[in-house]
Amino acid sequence: METQAVKTIRDELRELENTVAQASDMVLSEQDHRNASAIREMTQSVIAMSKENSLISVSNEIDYNEEIGNLAIDPSLIDEKIKQSNNFVELLKLTHLEQEALDYFLRYTISSTNTLELESTSDPKFVSLENEVTELENKTLTEHRDKIQEAKKDISDKSKDLANKQDQINELCLGAANSVDECWKMLNELEDIHSQRDNDVKETLSQDTTTTSDLIEETYKEWSSLQTSLTELNNSKDELDQLIAFKNEKHKDNDSTKIRNANIKNKTITENVKMLKLLINFWESNFIVPGSKKSKLSNLEVYPQTKKFQFKCAEQYTVIIQLNQNGGSIKSIEIFENDGKSVQENKNLSSLILNKYKNPLSSYPIFQVINDIVEELK
């Protein structure tokens, strides 16, 4: 079952995936529109030139009013066609100059009142004027050709730059899509890890379980045995006190060392009695009257082989206590919380309880620690 964090990540990934898809579609649409616009402009230019210049023609089968998308023009052939047209124009110009240069010059350049006496085309004056015309013509053509070459180079550079930027944008979109795919893979792996952890927790909680009725019966027997042991312990304490008092009176001077040892033993017995009383109060308040309002615990389960026991507290908490090897003190505490969807370890609660103890857990009575846990979780 997915957690809130996984659900949030999943929603963010979906949103990011939609954003990348929209950006990619927009980029591709802009590129298609730009290419279509360029082809449309070239097509319109060719059509316009074909109408204004008889040297350029378009197939008669093409309807000028039809959609541009149906008019097929290969831009790669334009340079070759332009070169062919330029060669053809040059031939026409040479022919025209050879046949009409003299007539054109005489009619529009030389005044009728100041005629030149030219005997032939080899006349020095004619040759000089012809050279001047050719020089001016070549200069003008060179300037125009330079401008055309410069414009062509500028167009080529901008086209290459635009193509490079388009490639970079496409690579960025592809990289973003690949990153989103990787995020989806990692999210699936995270869900598998969460699922495996939940299964491990459930398996741990279900090992070595005993029935509730057997547990209550066993607990009651242990409680009865503890009551008997406590009575015997109190009797032994009274006898020990009498014996110590007797020895103090009879061997006051000679047995001081033995008395100190007896006092130490008496102190240990007193601590044991106190712990047994805590145990009796704990069992009486939590297990002897199952289901009563005083009961704060339920589902007590004991695992003798692993030296673990667990119980439920406040309905949604399950507490697992690991005892030391000798079974007389606590080694560690784990608290699991059921939020209605899954069972997960609540490390914050565990840390909060452990921080209350300045010394190691093994130095505190077991049932004192359990009571503290119950009070914290109730």
Swiss-Prot record:
<comment type="function">
    <text>Acts as a component of the outer kinetochore KNL1 complex that facilitates microtubule-kinetochore interactions and the spindle assembly checkpoint. Kinetochores, consisting of a centromere-associated inner segment and a microtubule-contacting outer segment, play a crucial role in chromosome segregation by mediating the physical connection between centromeric DNA and spindle microtubules.</text>
</comment>
<protein>
    <recommendedName>
        <fullName>Outer kinetochore KNL1 complex subunit KRE28</fullName>
    </recommendedName>
</protein>
<dbReference type="GO" id="GO:0180019">
    <property type="term" value="C:Knl1/Spc105 complex"/>
</dbReference>
<dbReference type="Pfam" id="PF17097">
    <property type="entry name" value="Kre28"/>
</dbReference>
<feature type="coiled-coil region">
    <location>
        <begin position="130"/>
        <end position="172"/>
    </location>
</feature>
<comment type="similarity">
    <text>Belongs to the KRE28 family.</text>
</comment>
<keyword id="KW-0158">Chromosome</keyword>
<dbReference type="InterPro" id="IPR031361">
    <property type="entry name" value="Kre28"/>
</dbReference>
<comment type="subunit">
    <text>Component of the KNL1/SPC105 complex composed of SPC105 and KRE28. Part of the ten-subunit outer kinetochore KMN network that includes the KNL1, MIS12 and NDC80 complexes.</text>
</comment>
<keyword id="KW-0995">Kinetochore</keyword>
<feature type="coiled-coil region">
    <location>
        <begin position="224"/>
        <end position="277"/>
    </location>
</feature>
<dbReference type="GO" id="GO:1905325">
    <property type="term" value="P:regulation of meiosis I spindle assembly checkpoint"/>
</dbReference>
<feature type="coiled-coil region">
    <location>
        <begin position="1"/>
        <end position="32"/>
    </location>
</feature>
<dbReference type="GO" id="GO:0000776">
    <property type="term" value="C:kinetochore"/>
</dbReference>
<keyword id="KW-0175">Coiled coil</keyword>
<keyword id="KW-0137">Centromere</keyword>
<dbReference type="GO" id="GO:0031619">
    <property type="term" value="P:homologous chromosome orientation in meiotic metaphase I"/>
</dbReference>
<keyword id="KW-0539">Nucleus</keyword>
<dbReference type="GO" id="GO:0005634">
    <property type="term" value="C:nucleus"/>
</dbReference>
